[in-house]
C-alpha cells in the first residue's frame, strides 16, 4: 500500500470514529417517548382486551417491540412509554421484556400511564400526552426529544435521523416515506423544497399533494419526530393554552411548526436509495398482509438479521413438533413461521404464521392464516385467509374462509375477505369482565 493510499484509509477511519463518537454523544442526550396509548379500533376484536401496541405480531413479538428494538439497536437507552387504553397486557409485557436496561448507568424503559397529573383529564391527544409529562422530561434534561408511535412495523437506525437533525440545525425533523397517492389520505402529507425543508403539511388530506414529477406518489409522515427540546416545550405550552386545539401532533403541533420553525424531512430509505420497509398495521387487512409478507423466501423485513435483533420477552417453550407421516395425515409446514411450543399433529400448514403454544390436530389444513398464541384447532378443520385470536378453541370439522356468507354470520369479515375469529365469537369467554348488554 502506498503512502497516499495509507493516508486515505487513515482519514476514512478517523472520519468514521469521529462520526461514531458524535452520534453516541447525541443519542445519550436524547430522550425517546413512545406513544402507546392508542385504542386501535380498526383492529376490531384484536384490541378488545389489549392496546394496539400490545397486539402480537410475527409469531412471537408484540408490535411495540419493533420501535423499542430500533431504539436499543440505535444506541438510545432513555425511553418513556406513554400508555392509556387497556394497558394491562402492554405494561406486563414491558415489565417482562424490557427490564434488562441498567438504571445505574442512566438506561431505562419507563412506563408513563395517564395519571391526570395536570387536572381531571386523561391524555386528550398525542401532544397533550407529552404536555402532561413535561415535568418528567425536565427531570431527564435532554437536548433532544424523539417521539415515536408504538404501532408500526419496521427496522430503522434512529441515530442517522438524529444526526441529520443536529447537522441541519433544525427545530423539528419528521421521518417520511413515499406512499401511493390513494393511500396518502390516511397519513400526514408534506411538501418539501430541494433542501428537504418542509413547506406544507396537511393531516389526512382528501386530495393529497403529490411529489413533483411523480404524480402517483405522496410524501407521508411516519409519525416519527425529533425535536430540539426548547422548541418542543414552547410548542407544547402554546398548544395547551389554545382552546381550539385538538392537542394532536399531526393536526395541531406540526402544521403550526412549519410556519414558525425550521422543520425538515428525513426520508427513510435503504442504503441503495430505495424505499425502506415500513408498515402501518392499523387495519385487520394490513395486519394480515404484514404477517403474510414474513412467509416469503426473502421477506423485506428480515427477522433473522443478527446485526439488528428484534428483542422481546422469551417465553419458555419446547421446540415446535411435527408428528405423523401417513398419507393425508402428515405434520408439515410449508412457507410458514412456526414458533416454539407448537404441535402439528398430522396437520398441514401452508403460508401461515403460527404463534407459540398452538396445537393443530390431525387431518386439518391451515392456509394463508395468522394463528395467535395458545390456539387449539381440532381434527378435520379447514382454515384459510383467517386471523385466529389468542386462546381460541376451534372444534373438530370447523371450516373458516371458504364461505363468505357463513363466515359473516359467525365472525368478522374484512373488506378484503379476511376472517377474524375471537373466543367471544365462539361463546368462549376467557375474561371475567363482561360488558352489560
What residues fall within each predicted segment?
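Conserved core of the sugar-phosphate nucleotidyltransferase
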Residues: 156-230, 237
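Proline-centered turn/helix-capping motifs that create local helix->coil transitions or kinks
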Residues: 98-106, 194-200, 262, 298-303
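Short internal beta-strands
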Residues: 81-83, 176, 387
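Left-handed beta-helix
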Residues: 2-31, 230, 234, 238-437
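Conserved beta-strand termini and adjacent loop/short-helix elements that scaffold enzyme active sites
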Residues: 112-114, 175, 266-268
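Conserved N-terminal catalytic core of the sugar/cofactor nucleotidyltransferase
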Residues: 2-35, 42-51, 56-164, 192, ...
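Glycine-rich beta-alpha junction loops
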Residues: 86, 116, 179-181, 205, ...
Amino acid at each position: 500500500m502506498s503512502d497516499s493510499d495509507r493516508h486515505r484509509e487513515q482519514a476514512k477511519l478517523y472520519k468514521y470514529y469521529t462520526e461514531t463518537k458524535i452520534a453516541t454523544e447525541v443519542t445519550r442526550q436524547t430522550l425517546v417517548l413512545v406513544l402507546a396509548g392508542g385504542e386501535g379500533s380498526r383492529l376490531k376484536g384484536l384490541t378488545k382486551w389489549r392496546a394496539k401496541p400490545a397486539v402480537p405480531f410475527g409469531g412471537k413479538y408484540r408490535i411495540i417491540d419493533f420501535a423499542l428494538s430500533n431504539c436499543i439497536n440505535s444506541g438510545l437507552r432513555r425511553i418513556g412509554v406513554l400508555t392509556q387504553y387497556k394497558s394491562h397486557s402492554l405494561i406486563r409485557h414491558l415489565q417482562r421484556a424490557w427490564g434488562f436496561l441498567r438504571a445505574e448507568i442512566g438506561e431505562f424503559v419507563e412506563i408513563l400511564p395517564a395519571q391526570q397529573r395536570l387536572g381531571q383529564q386523561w391524555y386528550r391527544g398525542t401532544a397533550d400526552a407529552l404536555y402532561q409529562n413535561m415535568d418528567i422530561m425536565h427531570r431527564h434534561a435532554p437536548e433532544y426529544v424523539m417521539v415515536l408511535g408504538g404501532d408500526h412495523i419496521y427496522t430503522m437506525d434512529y441515530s442517522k435521523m438524529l444526526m441529520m437533525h443536529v447537522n441541519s440545525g433544525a427545530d423539528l425533523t419528521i421521518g417520511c416515506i413515499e406512499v401511493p397517492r390513494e393511500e396518502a389520505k390516511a397519513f400526514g402529507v408534506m411538501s418539501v423544497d430541494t433542501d428537504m425543508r418542509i413547506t406544507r403539511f396537511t393531516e389526512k388530506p382528501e386530495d393529497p399533494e403529490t411529489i413533483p414529477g411523480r404524480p402517483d406518489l405522496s410524501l407521508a409522515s411516519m409519525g416519527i419526530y425529533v425535536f430540539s427540546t426548547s422548541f418542543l416545550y414552547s410548542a407544547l405550552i402554546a398548544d395547551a393554552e389554545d382552546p381550539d386545539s385538538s392537542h394532536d401532533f399531526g393536526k395541531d403541533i406540526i402544521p403550526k411548526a412549519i410556519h414558525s420553525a425550521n422543520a425538515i424531512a428525513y426520508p427513510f430509505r435503504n442504503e441503495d436509495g430505495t424505499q425502506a420497509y415500513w408498515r402501518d398495521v392499523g387495519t385487520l387487512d394490513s395486519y394480515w398482509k404484514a404477517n403474510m409478507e414474513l412467509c416469503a423466501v426473502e421477506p423485506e423485513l428480515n427477522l433473522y438479521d443478527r446485526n439488528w435483533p428484534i428483542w422481546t420477552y422469551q417465553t419458555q417453550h419446547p421446540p415446535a413438533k411435527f408428528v405423523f407421516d401417513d398419507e393425508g395425515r402428515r405434520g408439515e409446514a410449508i412457507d410458514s413461521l412456526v414458533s416454539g411450543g407448537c404441535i402439528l399433529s398430522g396437520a398441514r400448514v401452508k403460508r401461515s404464521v403460527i404463534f407459540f403454544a398452538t396445537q393443530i390436530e390431525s387431518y386439518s389444513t391451515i392456509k394463508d392464516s395468522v394463528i395467535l398464541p395458545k390456539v387449539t384447532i381440532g381434527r378435520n378443520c379447514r382454515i384459510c385467509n383467517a386471523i385466529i385470536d389468542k386462546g381460541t378453541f376451534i372444534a373438530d370439522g370447523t371450516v373458516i374462509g371458504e364461505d363468505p356468507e357463513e363466515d359473516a354470520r359467525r365472525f368478522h369479515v374484512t373488506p378484503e375477505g379476511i376472517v377474524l375469529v375471537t373466543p367471544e365469537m365462539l361463546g368462549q369467554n376467557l375474561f371475567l369482565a363482561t360488558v352489560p348488554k
